[in-house]
Regions:
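Hydrophobic helical h-region of N-terminal Sec-dependent signal peptides
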Residues: 9-17
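C-terminal motif of bacterial Sec signal peptides marking the signal peptidase cleavage site
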Residues: 18-22
Length: 150
């Protein structure tokens, strides 16, 4: 019986040690994109500070601060600006037309979980309000004219 207990504990300890070694967190490593990508960010947002880069799929994404706002700026492999995502602290920071559009929608009583403004080079700005009610979750896209996109 003692042999079985020792063997069981040995397996538990080995699995625990393996689990911790497999959870290597590489947050300390800095990703550096190609020079044309960093130059594109400097051209678009010359005052960007505290820039941290990562890859999301095929896109280079700069997490940075510009005039007090935290932005995620997306570029393709050719250093073309794809979009900028600005996460807002509150729904109250939305432009009044979008705020009113949301308040007049069927989702106004739902819990707001996140609010973003998406800016594109060739398309109108969109506001995204993520809401939940119970197990249901939706991302509501509002056009610049306050209309809920279908």
């Amino acid at each position: 019986m003692l042999k079985f207990k020792f063997g069981a504990w040995a397996v538990v300890l080995m699995l625990t040690a393996f689990s911790f070694s497999a959870c290597d967190d590489n947050d300390d490593e800095t990703y550096n994109p190609p020079a044309n990508i960093t130059e594109a960010l400097k051209q678009l947002y010359p005052n960007a500070q505290n820039v941290e880069w990562e890859m999301k799929g095929d896109y280079y994404v700069a997490d940075c601060w510009v005039t007090g706002d935290e932005l995620d700026v997306w570029f393709d492999a050719n250093a073309n600006w794809v979009m900028t995502e600005n996460e807002l602290d509150s729904i109250d920071q939305l432009v009044p037309a979008v705020y009113t559009g949301f308040r007049n929608s069927n989702y106004s009583s739902w819990v707001v979980t996140d609010v973003f403004v998406l800016t594109y080079p060739q398309h109108p700005t969109e506001s995204v309000i993520q809401v939940k009610q119970g197990n249901l979750r939706f991302a509501l896209y509002f056009s610049a004219g306050r209309r809920l996109a279908a």
